[in-house]
C-alpha cells in the first residue's frame, strides 16, 4: 500500500507536468460529456487551484524582487530595459494587427441590454492615474488585493534599502525567497488536478452554447491572437536573437500558455512563468522583475480585445473609419491595455474608453462589454494565454540574446521530464 502511494506521489510530483495537464484536460472534457452534474461539482478543485496560485503569487513576487535587488552585486547585469521595450512594441503591434483583422474581416454585433452596474474609466488619463495610485498603495493592501504595481514598487524600494544591510540580513532574504519558491513548486505540481476541475465544470456549465451567436467576432479575436502568437511574436524574437524562434515560442506556449488558458489569470500564472525561467537557467535578477512586470503591462491580448470589439461596434453603427483614426486607436488600445491589469474586469471595461473616440455613447459601449462577457469563456482564456506566454517568451529572448551560453541548453531541449 505504501509503495502504491509512493508511486502515485512520484508520478504527481516528478512526472512531466505538460503530459499531466493534457491528461487533466482530456479527463475534464470526458467527465463534462458523460456526467455533467458531477462535472459541475469539480469546480471546487479548479477554484482551490486558482486561489492557491493567487495566494502565493504576490508573496513570491515580493520576496524574489526584494531578495534579487538586495543581493545584487555591482557589475552584475540585468536586462529589464530591453525586455520592457519588447513588451511595449508587442502590445502596439498586437493592436495594429487587430485593426487590420477588423478591416479584412469586419464583425457586426447584435447589441444586447446590459444590466450590470459598471464603472469604466472615462479617459486614458484616468487609466494612467489609476496605475500611479496603485504604485503608492499601502504594501499590506497591495499584497492582499494582488496589486502588482504596488508590490513591485515596495519590493524594489526595500531591495534598494537592503543593499546596505549586513550579509547576514541579505542571506536571510535569499533564504526566505528560496522557501517561498519551494512552496510555489508544490502548488504548480497540482496544476493537472486544478485544470481538470476548471475544464470539466466550465464545459458542463456553459456547454459553449452562449458562443454560437457571436461566433464570427470570436473567431476574429482568437484568429488574431493566434496570428500574434505564431507570426508577430516570432518575428520580434527572430529580430532579437537572429535564429529560428519557433522552438522557444512553442515551449512558452506549451509550458505557460496552456496553464494560463485555463486559469484565466496572468497574476496566477506568475509562479508558472517563474518556474519556467528557472528551468531555462535565465538570470534570476532579470526574470524576478520582468515576469511580474509583464503580468502588469504586457497586454497584447487585451489590446486585441479592445480594438476588435470597439471596431465591431463602429462597424455595427455604420461609422466610417480612416487609416489615421485606426492608427490612433491602435495607440490608444495599447496604452489602455497596459492599464488593464489595474481595472476590475480587465480589458472589457476599457472598451467604453476606446468607443468614446468615435462618439459612441456609454450605454451602447456597455452593450459591447456585455457581448465580451458572453464570449469571455474563450476570449478571456485566449487573451490570458497570449499575455502570459509572451512574458516568459520575451524575457527568455533578451536573456538569450545577451548570453549565448543559454542557447546550448534551452528548455526546448530539456523538456522530457
UniProtKB/Swiss-Prot annotation:
For this protein, what reaction is catalysed? Answer: L-serine(in) + Na(+)(in) = L-serine(out) + Na(+)(out); L-threonine(in) + Na(+)(in) = L-threonine(out) + Na(+)(out)
InterPro entries for the chain: Na-dicarboxylate_symporter, Na:dicarbo_symporter_sf, Ser_Thr_transp_SstT
| Keywords for this protein | Amino-acid transport, Cell inner membrane, Cell membrane, Membrane, Symport, Transmembrane, Transmembrane helix, Transport
Q: Where are the transmembrane segments?
A: 21-41, 49-69, 83-103, 142-162, 193-213, 218-238, 291-311, 331-351
- Give the UniProt record's GO annotations in the biological process aspect: serine transport; threonine transport
Gene Ontology CC terms: plasma membrane
Localized where? Cell inner membrane
Which GO molecular function annotations are given, in alphabetical order? neutral L-amino acid:sodium symporter activity
- Tell me which Pfam families the record gives: SDF
Provide the membrane topology annotation. Answer: Multi-pass membrane protein
Identify the PANTHER family for this entry: PROTON/GLUTAMATE-ASPARTATE SYMPORTER (PTHR42865), SERINE_THREONINE TRANSPORTER SSTT (PTHR42865:SF8)
Tell me, in a sentence or two, what this protein's role is. Involved in the import of serine and threonine into the cell, with the concomitant import of sodium (symport system).
What's the family? Belongs to the dicarboxylate/amino acid:cation symporter (DAACS) (TC 2.A.23) family.
- HAMAP family given in the database record: Ser_Thr_transp_SstT (MF_01582)
Q: What is this protein called?
A: Serine/threonine transporter SstT
Amino acid at each position: 500500500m505504501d509503495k502504491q502511494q509512493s508511486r502515485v506521489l512520484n508520478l504527481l510530483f516528478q512526472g512531466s507536468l505538460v503530459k499531466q495537464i493534457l491528461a487533466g484536460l482530456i479527463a475534464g472534457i470526458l467527465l463534462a460529456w458523460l456526467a455533467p452534474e458531477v462535472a459541475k461539482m469539480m469546480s471546487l478543485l479548479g477554484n482551490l487551484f486558482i486561489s492557491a496560485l493567487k495566494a502565493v503569487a504576490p508573496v513570491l513576487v515580493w520576496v524574489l524582487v526584494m531578495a534579487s535587488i538586495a543581493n545584487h552585486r555591482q557589475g552584475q547585469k540585468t536586462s529589464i530595459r530591453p525586455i520592457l521595450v519588447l513588451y511595449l512594441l508587442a502590445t502596439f503591434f498586437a493592436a495594429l494587427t487587430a485593426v487590420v483583422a477588423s478591416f479584412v474581416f469586419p464583425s457586426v454585433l447584435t447589441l444586447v441590454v446590459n444590466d450590470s452596474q459598471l464603472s469604466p474609466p472615462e479617459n486614458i488619463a484616468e487609466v494612467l492615474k489609476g496605475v500611479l495610485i496603485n504604485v503608492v498603495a499601502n504594501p499590506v493592501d497591495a499584497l492582499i488585493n494582488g496589486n502588482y504595481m504596488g508590490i513591485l514598487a515596495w519590493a524594489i524600494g526595500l531591495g534598494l534599502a537592503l543593499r546596505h544591510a549586513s550579509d547576514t540580513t541579505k542571506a536571510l532574504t535569499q533564504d526566505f525567497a528560496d522557501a517561498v519558491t519551494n512552496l510555489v513548486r508544490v502548488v504548480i505540481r497540482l496544476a493537472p488536478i486544478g485544470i481538470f476541475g476548471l475544464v470539466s465544470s466550465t464545459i458542463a456549465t456553459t456547454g459553449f452554447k452562449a458562443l454560437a451567436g457571436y461566433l464570427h467576432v470570436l473567431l476574429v479575436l482568437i484568429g488574431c491572437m493566434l496570428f500574434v502568437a505564431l507570426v508577430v511574436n516570432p518575428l520580434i524574437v527572430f529580430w532579437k536573437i537572429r535564429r529560428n524562434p519557433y522552438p522557444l515560442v512553442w515551449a512558452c506556449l506549451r509550458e505557460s500558455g496552456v496553464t494560463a488558458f485555463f486559469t484565466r489569470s496572468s497574476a496566477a500564472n506568475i509562479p508558472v512563468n517563474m518556474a519556467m525561467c528557472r528551468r531555462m537557467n535565465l538570470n534570476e535578477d532579470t526574470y524576478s522583475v520582468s515576469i511580474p512586470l509583464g503580468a502588469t503591462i504586457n497586454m497584447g491580448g487585451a489590446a486585441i480585445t479592445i480594438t476588435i470589439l470597439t471596431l465591431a461596434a463602429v462597424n455595427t453603427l455604420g461609422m466610417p473609419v480612416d487609416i489615421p483614426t485606426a492608427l490612433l486607436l491602435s495607440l490608444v488600445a495599447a496604452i489602455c491595455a497596459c492599464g488593464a491589469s489595474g481595472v476590475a474586469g480587465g480589458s472589457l471595461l476599457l472598451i467604453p474608453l476606446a468607443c468614446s473616440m468615435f462618439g459612441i455613447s456609454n450605454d451602447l459601449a456597455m452593450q459591447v462589454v456585455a457581448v465580451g462577457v458572453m464570449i469571455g469563456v474563450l476570449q478571456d482564456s485566449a487573451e490570458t494565454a497570449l499575455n502570459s506566454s509572451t512574458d516568459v517568451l520575451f524575457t527568455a529572448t533578451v536573456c538569450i540574446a545577451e548570453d549565448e551560453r543559454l542557447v546550448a541548453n534551452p528548455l526546448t531541449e530539456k523538456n522530457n521530464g
